[in-house]
A protein has these predicted regions:
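N-terminal strand-loop-strand beta-hairpin
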Residues: 2-143, 195-214
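Mixed-charge, glycine-accented linear interaction segment located at domain edges/termini
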Residues: 169-207
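Domain-wide signal for the mature, well-folded portions of proteins, strongly enriched
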Residues: 47-52, 113-117, 165-168, 175-185
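Conserved, surface-exposed functional patches that form binding/active-site neighborhoods
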Residues: 126-173
Length: 214
């Protein structure tokens, strides 16, 4: 009798690939200033909170014809940080949403703003728009939860959003399914303030506020 085990062909398990390094994996949701207090109350009771930061300041967006864009960010508060950052973002070819994008960040503290903007212009970038954000940032090991307002330059009306972002430093250790597990975990926690899968925004802030530049 031939051992059935010898006739068994084991199918090789196809391992799901990890997310690429420098990937920004996040979801956003519309909110309202009336949700801020409850958001903070909920998040501050979640175990393993690493730290909280409040920051505000302008984000200047610049675009290129190929669809990529740059963002120059300056943190005005806390005032002693003198935080400045230049970011390049790329939307993957064929992507249907902005949940996962390539993002490269450089700290540029101490570099004059005009030097950054002139350098961006020399690389083919064109100014598109400027917004000011006020952010309540809660950092956990696996994700960062943020409630923030957005105000366009020259406009008094503010928009409000909640954001769940997978930790950038370790996102490449996860598969996409594992990243979604983290997103869904925090969506369930934040459901009382209107955060759920049905309310995920398909557009990024860039797509919501960008101007048609000719």
């Amino acid at each position: 009798m031939i051992d059935e085990k010898l006739n068994t062909v084991e199918e090789a398990k196809v391992e799901e690939p990890k997310i690429a390094r420098f990937t920004e994996f996040e979801t956003k949701y519309n909110s309202d200033i009336t949700n801020l207090s409850q958001f903070k109350s909920i998040v501050e009771t979640i175990p393993d909170l690493l730290d909280f930061t409040y920051a505000e300041g302008p984000d200047t967006y610049l675009t290129k014809p190929d669809g990529s864009f740059g963002r120059y960010r300056v943190a005005k508060y806390p005032s002693d940080t003198k935080y400045a950052q230049w970011t390049l973002k790329f939307k993957p070819v064929g992507a249907k949403n902005n949940i996962s994008r390539l993002e490269y960040n450089w700290r540029v503290d101490g570099t004059p703003e005009q030097e950054i903007l002139d350098g961006a212009t020399a690389m083919g970038f064109t100014f598109n728009f400027k917004i000011t954000k006020q952010c309540h940032i809660y950092r956990f090991k696996d994700a960062t939860l943020v409630f923030y307002s957005v105000r366009e330059e020259g406009i008094t009306k503010e928009d409000y959003y909640v954001e769940i972002e997978i930790t950038e430093e370790t996102v490449h250790e996860l598969t996409e399914d594992q990243a979604w597990e983290v997103i869904r975990k925090y969506e369930k926690i934040l459901e009382p303030v209107g955060v759920n899968a049905q309310k995920r925004l398909r557009k990024s802030l860039f797509e919501m506020y960008k101007k048609d530049v000719k």
